Amino acid sequence: MSTPKFRPLKFGVTRVNMREGTSGVRYMLADQPLEDFATRMTDRLVHWATTKPDATMLAKRVKNADGSLGDWRHISYAQAWQSARAIAQALIDRGLNAERPVVIMSENDLEHALLSVGCLVAGVPFCAASPAYSTISQDFEKLRHILTTLTPGLVFAADAKRYGKAIEAAVGKDIEVVLHSGEITGRATTPFESLLATPATPAVDAAMQATGPDTIAKFLFTSGSTKLPKAVINTQRMWCANQQQMAQSMPVLAETPPVLVDWLPWNHTFGGNHNFGMVLYHGGTL
């Protein structure tokens, strides 16, 4: 029987200070202060695209026509930054903002990731809607609720075949639909590649610099287990501060860039904030 291999890990925060409040409330505070953190998550993307441009940020196995898995498709930090700038310009050209954000109707995917960072660069909030609301639901009630709540200016879906029915049922004709693959009969759509082909201008840099700690990065919706899902605003400060908390609690993240095999859905805070953010913040690979 082989001996299990263990890796020694250093934990940064192991103790807390507690004080008694009123009405039985107790307050706990880590025994070390929170250090300075990035102003915006895109600062980290720029940092890694500059310091290690060829390192893999994202990777996915290509699915062959017969359903088997082929080679890995890699996207480096430099490529992600270039793609994010192009997408950001496309979003700026469309006048999207917090009142007209981006809704993503797709599972975790490379295009989903690139669109997300493009939104961050442009300062346009995005929302990853639970794929189940589009692929399992028969009445699309929760999807309609998300669209009504956010009033998006653009909706993205990776696959027309998988998401076409939900788009036809819930997405208004006045909302631009961007598809990575396929077409929807009788409806004009925009290919995702056209966003990637948009030439970036100085407006992209200006838009990113205009974002700050209180800029809305994304909307996450609660699970809707008992009632309709509720939109939760996630600001740049919230996301960056949380990543710094994680970095101080788990110093190993700064010692070795994390490599994650990820399946947790990005419409949930664990997958979309914890894991995706951890990789981006520390120059890892997802």
Regions found by a protein language model. Give the residues of each.
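AMP-dependent adenylate-forming
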Residues: 15-29, 44-76, 217
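A short helix-loop-beta submotif of the ANL/AMP-binding
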Residues: 88, 109-134, 145-154, 258-259, ...
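Conserved ATP-dependent adenylate/AMP-binding module captured primarily in the ANL superfamily
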Residues: 133-168, 199-201, 242-261
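Conserved AMP-binding/adenylate-forming core of the ANL superfamily
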Residues: 33, 57-117, 134-142, 192-200, ...
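Short beta-strand elements of ligand-binding domains
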Residues: 106, 175-185
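Conserved AMP-binding
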Residues: 106-110, 130, 263-269
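Conserved pre-ATP/AMP-binding loop-to-beta segment of ANL
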Residues: 53-56, 180, 186-221, 227-228, ...
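Conserved AMP-binding/adenylation subdomain of ANL enzymes
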Residues: 240-259, 266-286
